From Swiss-Prot:
The keyword Transferase does not apply. This is Probable endonuclease 4. Its EC number is 3.1.21.2. The keyword Metal-binding applies. It comes from Bacillus cereus (strain G9842). Zn(2+) 3 binds at H183, D228, H230.
Length: 298
């Protein structure tokens, strides 16, 4: 079974149940959530996440596995502000606890961190230090380091940087990788014409068995732009054909594929989620040039 879904919202009183209902309405077989707002660390207690009802709904609809994404504000790569580093460490520990409580997520996607001017090597050493403070041999969930576009002072912009982080971490069996198509393209990898070659390079440097999550996004920018701006499937510089090939790649069939493409519409207050129609289009193998108008009309 193709594991494909999108980022969905876990909010209100229904929490996990709301997320599962939204995912099912898109025809998804997996989904990704933030356990609270991605831009802050305010979180509801575990008992208010409505886990039991959410899991029951998932089971009834054949969803076995979901992904958690850590908030953007975590930066364990920060060498200049000890309080930012410490917040990242403490919050990651909490996220591991919350994700374990969900019982249906095995991966927490994490942007590795930004070196904020200290240089990539210093940032990577700080990320290693942070992960060594967080990871334990007993934990049942992995931290999935996301491949980054190389915007600003981001670490993890190359497979070598990801491998360096993994190699420095003591309990690195608890580390995996989230391969983001937009980020990897923006970082300079030719996933359009030679995805198999890129995957082979990833396997040599990091190990393909570490690739446990895929973020499926088109890109508004040319390859190597280092920008990180997601585009709807088939309307960017990666294109439908390449993304369809990645989604159905025989070596990655077991990997959950998560869409983080932009909502569609001119009116900021009335944008529509593209996921139902994009998932359908990636399943059926035919690019629909009129899909954006259909999304707006939903």
């Amino acid at each position: 079974m193709l594991k494909i879904g999108s980022h969905v919202s876990m909010s209100g009183k229904k929490m996990l149940l709301a997320a599962s209902e939204e995912a099912v309405s898109y025809g998804a077989t997996t989904f990704m959530i933030y356990t609270g707002a991605p831009q802050n660390t305010r979180r509801k207690p575990i008992e208010e996440l409505n886990i039991e009802a959410g899991r029951k709904h998932m089971e009834l609809n054949g969803i076995e596995e979901i992904i958690v994404h850590a908030p953007y504000i975590i930066n364990v790569g920060n060498t200049t502000k000890p309080e930012t580093f410490q917040l990242g460490v403490d919050f990651l520990r909490m996220e591991i606890e919350r994700t374990s409580a969900l019982g249906v997520a095995k991966q927490i996607v994490l942007h590795p961190g930004a070196h904020v001017g200290a240089g990539a090597d210093a940032g990577i050493q700080q990320i290693i230090k942070g992960l060594n403070e967080v990871l334990t041999p007993e934990q049942t969930v992995n931290i999935a380091l996301e491949t980054m576009a190389g915007k600003g002072t981001e670490c993890g912009r190359s497979f070598e940087e990801i491998a360096k982080i993994i190699d420095g971490v003591k309990y690195n069996e608890k580390l995996s990788v989230c391969f983001d198509t937009c980020h990897t393209h923006d970082a300079g990898y030719d996933i359009v014409n030679d995805f198999d070659g890129v995957l082979n390079e990833f396997d040599k440097i990091v190990g393909i068995d570490r690739l446990q999550v895929l973020h499926i996004n088109d890109s508004k920018n040319v390859r190597g732009a280092g920008k990180d701006r997601h585009e709807n499937i088939g309307f960017g510089h990666i294109g439908y054909k390449a993304l369809h090939h990645i989604v159905h790649h025989p070596q990655l069939m077991h990997v959950p594929k998560i869409l983080e493409t932009p909502y569609v519409g001119e009116d900021k207050k009335d944008k529509k989620p593209p996921y139902k129609l994009e998932i359908e289009m990636l399943k059926n193998g035919n690019f629909d040039e009129g899909i954006l108008e259909k999304i707006k009309a939903q």
